Amino acid sequence: MLPMITGFMNYGQQTLRAARYIGQGFMITLSHTNRLPVTIQYPYEKLITSERFRGRIHFEFDKCIACEVCVRVCPIDLPVVDWKLETPIRKKRLLNYSIDFGICIFCGNCVEYCPTNCLSMTEEYEFSTYDRHELNYNQIALGRLPISVIDDYTIRTILNSPQIKNG
């Protein structure tokens, strides 16, 4: 009879210990209820990017002097610059400029070292496509300015994001 009583006491202690562990886990879960959500509903909500965000490169054809500094400072020699030497005036004339964003690592060296500031980073980061050859942008595609997330009325922007507060 005595072993049966001690068995019930051990069972009761184990039950209380299990209830305490479950309660501790539940308290941790409840402590997360007053935090802001981490995820956003992507196609309908977008984060406002920071000022120094490195998105798609914008190119101004008229400012470029075809010096090829962007190609020399690029770690992967990515920008393709085609030019022709105009012999009467002894200057280079830019024919074509293209960047393949499927290969680009968005380091920003080309933008930083461009002597004429014809390159700049935009806030556009959506490059989804079914064909990777569509990511090769020529000077016409690079010259288009993207629609700002703030100006697009179909998208709700998220200002109270933990990433923006911390970064």
UniProtKB/Swiss-Prot annotation:
What membrane topology is given?
Peripheral membrane protein
Q: Name one GO biological process term.
A: photosynthesis, light reaction
Q: Does the keyword Phosphoprotein apply?
A: no
State the compartments where it is located.
Answer: Plastid, Chloroplast thylakoid membrane
Could you tell me the keywords of this UniProt record?
4Fe-4S, Chloroplast, Iron, Iron-sulfur, Membrane, Metal-binding, NAD, NADP, Plastid, Plastoquinone, Quinone, Repeat, Thylakoid, Translocase
> One Pfam family name from the record?
Fer4
* Cofactor(s) for this UniProt protein: [4Fe-4S] cluster
Q: What is its EC number?
A: 7.1.1.-
Q: Which InterPro entries match?
A: 4Fe4S_Fe-S-bd (IPR017896), 4Fe4S_Fe_S_CS (IPR017900), NADH_quinone_OxRdtase_chainI (IPR010226), NDHI (IPR004497)
Gene3D superfamilies reported for this sequence: 3.30.70.3270
Ranges of residues in domain 4Fe-4S ferredoxin-type: 55-84, 95-124
Q: What is the catalytic activity of this protein? A: a plastoquinone + NADH + (n+1) H(+)(in) = a plastoquinol + NAD(+) + n H(+)(out); a plastoquinone + NADPH + (n+1) H(+)(in) = a plastoquinol + NADP(+) + n H(+)(out)
The entry's [4Fe-4S] cluster 2-binding residues are 74, 104, 107, 110
Q: How does it assemble?
A: NDH is composed of at least 16 different subunits, 5 of which are encoded in the nucleus.
Descriptive protein name: NAD(P)H-quinone oxidoreductase subunit I, chloroplastic
- Organism of origin is Aethionema cordifolium (Lebanon stonecress)
| Gene that this polypeptide is encoded by | ndhI
